[in-house]
Amino acid sequence: MKPSFVISLTLCSISAAVGQEILSDPGTLGPALETIHLFYDQWLTGFTVSASGHIFVNYPPVFPNSINFTVGEIVNGREVPYPNLEINTPPGGRLNYSTNPPTSSNSEDHLIGVISVITDTEDRLWILDSGRVASTEGLAETAYGGPKLIGMHLTHNTIFKKILFDQTAVPADGYLNDVRIDLNPALTPSGQGVAYISDNSPEGRTAIVVVDLGSGAASRKLVGDPSISSHPGFVPFIWGEAVYSNSSSISHFSVGVDGIALSADGSTLYYCPAGGRSLYGIETKYLLDNSHNSDVLSRSQIQVLGDKGLSDGLETDSNNNIYGGNMEDNSIIKFNPKTGLVQPFVRDPRLSWTDTLSVATDGYLYFTENQLWRAPIYWGGIDRRVKPYAMFRVKLPDGGVKVSRPRRE
């Protein structure tokens, strides 16, 4: 065979190969994202959308000297303190330097370090104040008066409930993270409903805190259980990079129970550690049980629901679908409790750390992308976050909306 013919044949083969499309990941799936707001200033985590369309946002002081106010509202495209700047400004600052080491402010009448906000089925706003603030040495411990749950009437922006947590409910190194409200009057003697709160203490003192919204009585459940703890040796991979924490030269990503969500009828609490990929559930009747041996019984009733990817927050719609981020897949997943199936709901290259999700009465799932995994605590003190942070929304499937009907009355 002549060399010139061989060369011609080879070139034809290469040309055909180049012209043939190689299968690749499309990178997107599901409904298109709508951009709701871009955050160019303070770093956010939680938010909620009221029935009237008002959007409330919280900015936790988990990085030193990072915020001017810890709860805000988006008004005409601007973020303003909510309900005002005064309540967001503790006298003497957020840190108490009269103690050694410094502790977080203990002001009962001011917002210290809000980590979550949520609206209930009566369209009232609940503000969860962790009471913890970052110093240059790390997260300062709390003092009584800091950790609290505040209820706000949105009509007049006034406080109707304030529950302070002592250290039997929330230890000084606890970190209240997320909250869900069930207003079913049959759940407690007070008839005012219950709050379920995740405590993902960085020091490892994890728990689910159950609060009677009438009496303010609070109890810690499933303390330190493996299901609410970071999975040993867990390393997330986001945008092709392994993410470690900086507590030592090589430290795994150790974050305990974070996201929680109630089933539409309030009978089950779903939850997940951020330091893992598993989803868990437990019937709320076991969390509400304070009888002898109730702790042993509740631990035996934990449901292991399988892997759903790495998630931070969780959320429920009126069809009882459970939604959560899947950071390693640039996606949001949908879990169907009836079938036990987890499926991607939406994918987009802009997704990386889907922090908080909120289903609204308008039939949309709102969520925030805050680049937490690019924060200095994971990259040797180098801040790799690039503003703006973002809030998006997507239309829910099958007519899903915010859960609004009474639960189990």
Each model region followed by its residue ranges:
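Beta-propeller blade signature
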Residues: 69-77, 143-157, 208-216, 381-399
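Surface-exposed loop and turn segments in beta-propeller and other repeat-based domains
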Residues: 32-36, 78-109, 157-174, 218-250, ...
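Blade-loop segments of beta-propeller domains
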Residues: 43, 70, 74-126, 130-137, ...
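Fungal secretory targeting signals
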Residues: 1-19
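Beta-strand-rich domains and repeat architectures in extracellular enzymes and scaffolds
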Residues: 30-69
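Short loop/turn segments immediately following the C-termini of beta-strands
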Residues: 60-62, 130, 200-203, 213, ...
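Beta-rich, blade/repeat-based domains predominating
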Residues: 40-51, 103-128, 133, 168-198, ...
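Blade-level signature of beta-propeller repeat domains, shared across WD40, Kelch, NHL, RCC1
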Residues: 356-409
